[in-house]
Amino acid sequence: MVRLALVVAEFNYDITSLMLQKAIEHARFLGAEVTYVVKVPGVYDIPMVLKDVVAKSDVDAVATLGAVIQGATKHDELVAQQAARKILDIAVEVDKPITLGIIGHGANRMQALERVEEYARRAVEAAVKLARRKKLLKDAKYSGATVYVE
């Protein structure tokens, strides 16, 4: 069973609380166990806790959830791009799956609400699949025939 942590931004919590509910439901559907739900103030703050979360021995993968709503300036673009870049950097550094379930940039509130389920499910599904496949790859042995890890 994959042990999954969810890191959720509280900013735009009317949206991210729904994402959290959908993520937990989908994790259960996939047979994963949600071991931690960690709330942070905003999407930009997600990278601040990731190393602590992935260091937990009872976490195989992390799905990040958040919503960056378009405003009058380019602030949403900056927040979403920098958070995504740092999340990927940390995932590669720690060698554990950390997936991106962040709506935005450029999304308005209505678009974000329409994308709640899709983004939450995709982030959880990718995290669970990656964790399972990393384990399969680690345990795989080549014996003269191509090894497929799927």
From Swiss-Prot:
Q: What Gene3D superfamilies is this protein classified in? A: Lumazine/riboflavin synthase
GO BP term, pick one: riboflavin biosynthetic process
Gene from which this protein is expressed: ribH
Q: Which family does it belong to?
A: Belongs to the DMRL synthase family.
Give the EC number(s) listed in the UniProt record: 2.5.1.78
**Name of the protein described by the UniProt record:** 6,7-dimethyl-8-ribityllumazine synthase
The organism's lineage is: Archaea, Thermoproteota, Thermoprotei, Thermoproteales, Thermoproteaceae
State the UniProt keywords alphabetically: Riboflavin biosynthesis, Transferase
Q: Which residues cross the membrane?
A: none
GO CC annotation terms, alphabetical: riboflavin synthase complex
GO molecular function terms noted in the UniProt entry: 6,7-dimethyl-8-ribityllumazine synthase activity
**Which reaction(s) are listed as its catalytic activity?**
(2S)-2-hydroxy-3-oxobutyl phosphate + 5-amino-6-(D-ribitylamino)uracil = 6,7-dimethyl-8-(1-D-ribityl)lumazine + phosphate + 2 H2O + H(+)
Job description of the protein: Catalyzes the formation of 6,7-dimethyl-8-ribityllumazine by condensation of 5-amino-6-(D-ribitylamino)uracil with 3,4-dihydroxy-2-butanone 4-phosphate. This is the penultimate step in the biosynthesis of riboflavin.
Q: Where does (2S)-2-hydroxy-3-oxobutyl phosphate bind?
A: A72, T73, R115
Q: Which domain of life is it from?
A: Archaea
**Residues the record lists as binding 5-amino-6-(D-ribitylamino)uracil:** F11, V43, Y44, D45, A67, V68, I69, L100
